[in-house]
Every structure is written in C-alpha cells, then in structure tokens.
Amino acid sequence: MKVLVLNGSPKAERSNTLNITKAFLKGFPADTEVEQVNLYKKDIKPCLGCFSCWSRTPGQCVIKDDMQDIYEKIKAADIVIESFPLYFFGMPSQMKATTDRCLPFMLPYMGNLVEDKNASFHELRDESMHEKRLVVITTCGYVDEKPMYPALLKQLDLIAGEGHYTAILCPEGELFIADKAKRQREGYLAEITRAGAEFAQNRALSEETKKLSLIHISEPTRLQLIS
C-alpha cells in the first residue's frame, strides 16, 4: 500500500496537524510505503486558468514546476492524505494552489448539471483514479468544528463528491501546544491511531469512529489547560 501525504502547513514538520496525520498513519501496517511532500517547500505556481489541460494538451499542465513530480506521486499512490490547518475557513494558499493545479485530472465541464449529489462536479479523466482514497486531516483553533468547516467541506464535496473522501476535523488545535494538555492530547492521538488502523483495513471509517476522532473539552477545562 502506498500513501502520499501532502503537508499543506507552512510550519512543515512543526505542524500540529501533521502530528495527527502521523498518529493516523501509525495505525497502518508496518510495510506501508509512506511519502510526505511539504508543499511550502515546493515550487508550485498558481493555476493560470488557461485550460490548456482541457484543450491543447489534454490531461497535461503546461506549467513546468514541482507539480509535475507531484502529479506522478498522486498517480502512484493508493491513498492521498491532505494534512493542513484551516485558514480563513479554507485551505492554506499552497494547499489551494496544489488543488487548483489538479484540474488536469478532471474532464472538461460540458454544461451538464450534476444530478447525483454524491458525484464530483467534474468527471475524472482516468477511471483508475476512482480506486484511490482521499483523506483530509485538518485542524482549527476554535472550540467547535460545526461553524468552521462548512465552506471547506462543500468545496471538497464538489471536487471529490460527497462521501467519496474521509474528513478528520480537529477543533481546539491550541491544545497541541499547551503543556498542561498532555493527557488529553495523548488520549486523542491514541483514538486517531485506532482510526488509522480501521481505515487501513476498510478504506473507510465508521460513523462511530468519526465521532471519536473529534476532540471536545469543556470550556472551564480548556481554559485551565491553555492558561
């Protein structure tokens, strides 16, 4: 099994989100091939909106930068994990640029509305891409994930199709840098490792496991931990 981690945090290895991602991967079999790409250390230019990947050079982006190598890594992976903190209700800029540059994987929009809400807005160019699994692991500083993630999840629904990706949403991200929160942090990461083992076996998470992957601490306790 090959796993590609696209680390979209500008903190690179110091990313709090990456700690969760590594805990998730700890649940995978020992022989899993894991490759990590720190996007902020790569030369990834923004999409030009030229649509050459849909017309003049179908399936091929005309921009020659590090995305050409990332395309090949995505094609070779069985599972792609996007790991990033929530920035202004969405992806950090380098993660968004990478997402924009994945347009060559999609077929052109031909003016037909998608009736199936579980389908992506654009059809994938290569049928083999349907066999891959996408996992999105993301943190935010707010105490509740519900008001923070609707915009991001709607975008992912349109890109990948509702139910065609696995999202692990982690609010209260500041607990990962609070000295007093070690016990809560370790307990949460243990749950994430168990979730990783389940995903590695089933390529999906049960609804119960999704709930356990959320960290919620009461307001008085949270204030004590971060003070």
What is the role of each PLM region?
Residues 62-155:
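Helix-loop-strand module that forms the ligand-binding subsite of alpha/beta enzymes
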Residues 215-227:
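Single conserved hydrophobic/aromatic residue that forms the stacking wall/gate
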